[in-house]
């Protein structure tokens, strides 16, 4: 779709700016204040960082993104690691943050803690680049297991629906029921 293409172009422009200083194209120059401030943060910058996480029922471990034992896959738009602290950013190209959901940040923070064992605190944000809104959240290593559990309840409901072949409508902004 056109919106998807636009989102991909924005992500690529931000990635190339952070990675190698490629100037932001004119049509996306509204990104400059955001990417300049992110680029000024101290630390090792990782763009489009792919996480593969396995889970054996007791412990979450790092694995390859397409490994057979992968339990969770996620891609962080930008992770900046500076010793025990990190910054995690997910760019959003929607009009505004009205339907912002930070559950994605919880899972990516959990994966960041797994990938970078030295990190103990993460400041994360959904960066709505068009409206210049930031939905922020702090994460601590002590709560890592609760971040991984973010989708336990909906996944259990999905498994039950599949087992009993009962698919009840769920009210929400994207549901016409």
Predicted regions and their residues:
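Metal-dependent nuclease catalytic regions and adjoining charged, substrate-binding loops involved
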Residues: 55-62, 68, 97-100, 110-177
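Regular secondary-structure segments
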Residues: 11-18, 155-159
């Amino acid at each position: 779709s056109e919106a998807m293409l636009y989102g991909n172009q924005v992500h690529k422009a931000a990635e190339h700016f952070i990675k190698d200083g490629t100037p932001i194209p004119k049509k996306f120059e509204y990104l400059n204040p955001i990417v300049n401030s992110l680029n000024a943060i101290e630390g090792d910058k990782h763009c489009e960082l792919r996480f593969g996480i396995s889970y054996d029922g007791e412990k979450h471990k790092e694995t390859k993104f397409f490994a057979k034992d992968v339990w969770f896959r996620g891609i962080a738009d930008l992770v900046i690691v500076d010793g025990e602290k990190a910054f995690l950013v997910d760019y959003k190209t929607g009009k505004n943050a009205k339907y912002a959901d930070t559950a994605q940040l919880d899972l990516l923070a959990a994966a960041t803690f797994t990938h970078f064992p030295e990190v103990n605190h993460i400041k994360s944000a959904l960066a709505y680049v068009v409206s210049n809104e930031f939905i922020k959240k702090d994460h601590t290593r002590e709560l890592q297991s609760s971040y991984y559990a973010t989708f336990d309840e909906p996944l259990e409901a999905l498994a039950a629906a599949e087992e009993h072949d009962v698919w009840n409508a769920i009210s929400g902004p994207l549901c016409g029921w």
